[in-house]
Structure formats: structure tokens, C-alpha cells
Amino acid sequence: MTEKVAVLLGGTSAEREVSLLSGQAVLAGLKEAGINAHAVDTRDVSVTTLKEEGFTKIFIALHGRGGEDGTLQGVLEFLGLPYTGSGVMASALTMDKLRTKQVWQAVGLPVSPYVALDRRQYSEMAANALLATFTHLGLPLIVKPSREGSSVGMSKVNTLSELPAALEEAFRHDDDILVEKWLSGPEYTVAILGDEVLPSIRIQPAGTFYDYEAKYLSDDTQYFCPSGLSDEKEQELAGLAMAAYRAVGCSGWGRVDFMLDSDGAFYLLEVNTSPGMTSHSLVPMAAHQRGLTFSQLVVKILELAG
């Protein structure tokens, strides 16, 4: 049977616009390699029709809910269609930053100090009790929804007076949020392709932190690959990335994000099971450092589909 690939893009999540860019880039890369690939916007087309439309393999270029959270993966499993990236369990787990942190803590991997808060707790706690909950974390803080990507709903809190607005913003996007200690060092990201760890990238945003604008819109964000780490630190980071990736059951490809704190220690932030593939994206940058063109990268990811 001739292979016919659906590149799933767009969707309905808060990361729709990024996904459209990722998907079109992936589509162009696959076509450059001579693969019979077609764009499918899951906002407009039901994925349950993919098999009857003759598609034999699925490249997931969706980000966020409905594409990266295990629900789509479950449908594709039911249809018997091979797809790129992690399976149902790992996709669902890593979409939830809190549960991911809990797994990493259980196996002894380093995560930044945090407090988890749900909407019910927030509504029932008095203001002074709420503030007391976070005092041991110190200032500044970073507040984020547990189940959003691309830094959607995330805020930095420099003074306690800024905390209520940051909590409200995070709760606009999720019923569970995380309040974390602010880590002062640079951010690093490590891409994984099959069983191979790609070179790390150091991220230097022009603004306060690596938010949505810095990730996708700003030309002022700087990326360093090679990252400038010593060989010893690079090996340490690669080992941590693979351990974190495997602990939550990921497969195929993905990207693990870290912060290096002022104490010289790496702390895990999250795993992306369907990383961005735009002109600003990091996995293509790391793959290029390893000698892979964009087209070769997307073909390799497709070959890893299961």
C-alpha cells in the first residue's frame, strides 16, 4: 500500500496559531522528501474520518489540549493508525505539569520547589492564609496553569501584591495551577529523537522570561547551540533529560526543558511531547547542529511513528 500521511495541525487549543505554523513547515519538509503528505486541520475535519480517507500514518503537529494530551492519541489507537510522538499515557501525563512533577519527585529527579493549588482551595482560603502558603518559596515566584503549553497563562510575581492577579490569570486557563520558586539561571532545552539525545540549547529571552511572545514572535530572543556548557555539564544534562523522558513513558521524539539555578544545579520544568516546528523552534535547531536538515528531521520523526 502506498503511504499517505496526514499532518494534523491547527486544532482548537490556545496554541492553534503556533500549530498552523508548525504543521505547514512539517508538510513542506515531508513533501521535499517526496512523501505523499496532506494538511488536515482538526478544527474543521473529524479525525475519525482519517482512515476512510485513505491515510496510513499520522504526523501530529498539534500543540496543547486536544492534540498533545492523550485524547487524540487514543482515537488514533482505536483507528489503528500509526502516529508520531508519545502514546496515550505519556501524552496525557506530560500535559499535566503537576502530575509530571510528582512522578519525577517519586523517582528522585530534581524539580523546583512549588505549591499546587486548585480552584476550590483558592476560593475557600482567606487572603492571609493564601499568602502564607507561598512564603517558604520566597520571591520572585512564577505562576502557571498546570495544563497549558507555550507559557500561556504564566506570570512572574515580584511582590506579594502581584500574586492575586497572577493567580486569576492562571485560573483563567486551568482549574489546577502551580506556584513555583523563581529560578534565576538560564533556561536550557534538550531534544530527544528516538534513543538519541541532541545537543542542548541555551535560551536567552530579551524580556523577563521565556514567554509566548519570546517563543514565537520576538526576534530578540537568543538561542545558543552549542549551549556553552562544559562537556561534563552537557553529559549531566543529557542524562537528566533521558531519565526524565523515560520516567513519564515518552517515546518517538520530544523536548525536555530545564532551568539552571544560581546554585549550579539543573531543575526540570516540563516535557513537550509535540514540540514546536516553526522558524523559531528548538528541535530543528538542535537537529541542525547534529547535521540533519529540516526535511531529514521530519522524515526521521515520521519513521519513528508507532
From Swiss-Prot:
| InterPro entries the UniProt entry points to | ATP-grasp, ATP_grasp_subdomain_1, D-Ala_lig_Van_CS, D_ala_D_ala, Dala_Dala_lig_C, Dala_Dala_lig_N, PreATP-grasp_dom_sf
Subcellular location per the Swiss-Prot or TrEMBL entry = Cytoplasm
Q: Where does Mg(2+) 2 bind?
A: E270, N272
Q: Which reaction does it catalyse?
A: 2 D-alanine + ATP = D-alanyl-D-alanine + ADP + phosphate + H(+)
The keyword Magnesium is annotated on this UniProt entry: yes
**Cofactors per UniProt?**
Mg(2+); Mn(2+)
- Pathway(s) where this gene product acts: Cell wall biogenesis; peptidoglycan biosynthesis
- Give its E.C. classification number: 6.3.2.4
Q: Which GO terms describe its molecular function?
A: ATP binding; D-alanine-D-alanine ligase activity; metal ion binding
Q: What keywords sit in the KW lines?
A: ATP-binding, Cell shape, Cell wall biogenesis/degradation, Cytoplasm, Ligase, Magnesium, Manganese, Metal-binding, Nucleotide-binding, Peptidoglycan synthesis
- Name the protein family: Belongs to the D-alanine--D-alanine ligase family.
Q: Which HAMAP family match?
A: Dala_Dala_lig
Role, per record: Cell wall formation.
Protein's recorded name: D-alanine--D-alanine ligase
Q: Which organism is it from?
A: Pectobacterium carotovorum subsp. carotovorum (strain PC1)
Upper lineage ranks? Bacteria, Pseudomonadati, Pseudomonadota, Gammaproteobacteria, Enterobacterales
